[in-house]
């Protein structure tokens, strides 16, 4: 498939892709509530002639899967975009500001959907030239994987067969720390695993002026928090990477009361599965040791949320070569390891996958604010690059596997 042809077609849909992103941005929906977003995407795909469109996952009306050339012999590739917004009140002053109070697309998923829809338009325009099949995956609840009350959308879609008959998968994330139009990717380990934990420390409540009659769980909790960092500094090989952070401590009801219990909640980030497996063992041991010394009792609740994002080596090399051909060698970078997490990793546990960052940072346009901040925004000039990369890589993959 001619790369220049893809570029020309992408350019023709440039304004439409930008408008789609603005519409998604105005009407954000949080994890497992992406009903209207799903309806809009499904309607567009039917209008553009896609077949075998399936809507909904996990008994909801959220998420869309659609196939291009479903009956064609040959290789197959899936392209994925996440859909959900965040419970954040937007502080941007743009014509397409969120119209949903307290909810905004603060991580760029509006861009991901618009880019994948743009790639869908391009690929449907050249479908007769494609020697294989393309599956589009619009996934709900990527952010949903970060809370114990929710489920990662990727994992749910896999359970319902979204990868059946698919040889490989590709996805992207818009990235404000990276200059608009640049691409960053990394073969092998790319983004960390994400786990959550809560330690509850139980003592015996009492009067703050009579500590001898109480068993102080706050003292145990503060000692526990301090000693936690010895896991990273003294138990994890210095050549490995691990993060252990405390995000929340809940205790007490008044200034003069020693509480009965303290709840400490945090996250771990790892790349090495052996270290990830050992984290709850190490946390529990420190909690038990501290509590034994200070007459308290500890309980650990440990939840493994998202595995590390591991890019397939060969597929990533192929993507890098394709990207260099589309946007130029100087605009493709090898990324450092990234400590945030992404449930695209569930797909990569099943089939070869490549995930990359697309830069959208432009200080002149105010699009260099951090992800998950109320002033996060995307430079629309990045969108057409994303369309070309997804469509171009899908076409190159199918041609190379023929």
Question: Which residues fall in each region the model found?
Answer:
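Active-site beta-loop-alpha junctions enriched in small/polar residues
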Residues: 29, 82-84, 141-143, 175, ...
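Acidic/His- and Gly-rich active-site-bordering loop/insert found
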Residues: 2-105, 114-131, 135
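Histidine/acidic-residue-rich, glycine-tolerant segments that coordinate divalent metal ions
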Residues: 62, 86-87, 92-104, 110-111, ...
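Non-cysteine beta-strand/loop elements that form the S-adenosyl-L-methionine
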Residues: 78-80, 197-199, 355-360
